[in-house]
Each structure stands twice: as C-alpha cells, then as structure tokens.
C-alpha cells in the first residue's frame, strides 16, 4: 500500500457559508496548541502562488470543471476524492493519471469533463486562479476528513448504476460521495 502523508490541517467545520475552517496544530515547548484557520473564496484571493506543480494544475483543472459552481467546501470535497484515489492501489498513482483515466473513450472516463465530447475552456480566470490556490494548498497533504474516505462521487442530477456497489458516505453541495465498502472475512 502507498504511504499516506497527512499534515496537521484538519477540517473542523465543513460549512461556514462559503468557507471551510481548519485547526492547525502548532508544536511549541509548552506542547501543541490548536489555531483555527478559515479559508473562504475571499481569503483564497489573497494567497500568492509561486511555481505550481503540474499535478496541482491537473487537480485545479478537475476542480474547475467538476465543481466550480460549488462553494469552497464542495470544491475541497472533489479534490479530496481525487487525492484519496491517488493513495489507493486500485487507481493510478498521480493526480494527472487519476483525472485522465479513461479519457480516450467517449463517456468512459472517471471524470465526465474529460470524455463528454465537448471542448473544455477555462472562461472564468478569477475562479480558476482561486481554485488553483485551493488545489495547491490541499495537494501538500491536508488531512482528508470531509468525505469519509470517498473515492467516487456524482452530481445529484444523475443516478448512475455503479452506486449500488458502493457505500454512500456524504452529500456535500450538489454532489453525493461514495467509497468501496470494506468486506470482513468470516472464519
């Protein structure tokens, strides 16, 4: 199995309007303290970007096309699913490979924007830059506690047949999240 690296950021409140709140553990000589940090669309506008990893760009593109109409919480949830897949052996081991899996066949991909037969354009540059900052922040190892370990999701507007084989974990924004149900062997 792949090693999963989790930093000290932990979401503590998934919905504060258009924001997500995190507790950050700070180590000091007196022990560890928890500081609360809240990220919203507005606060993301003020973050600066340096050189961006190509994997972060793939993550941002997927968030943009799959969840740009969602608030920060919904966008984070989609990012979490993609990163959860990267950590699982049954999926490709990079963000770019995860989001492009099956893209060569019409309607056979994992992320519909990649194989719906329509060209994709980033028309809202302000939203894309904000999403790129969000992707950069979460790619660096933020703990993924929002979706209950989900590796699948779909819009509430559809009812795909593949959901019957999965365990529903959460509904966030306009998406429903699922994970592969663990099976326990009986002796």
Q: Over which residues does each language-model region extend?
A:
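Bacterial extracytoplasmic/cell-wall-associated proteins, especially those involved in peptidoglycan
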Residues: 1-187
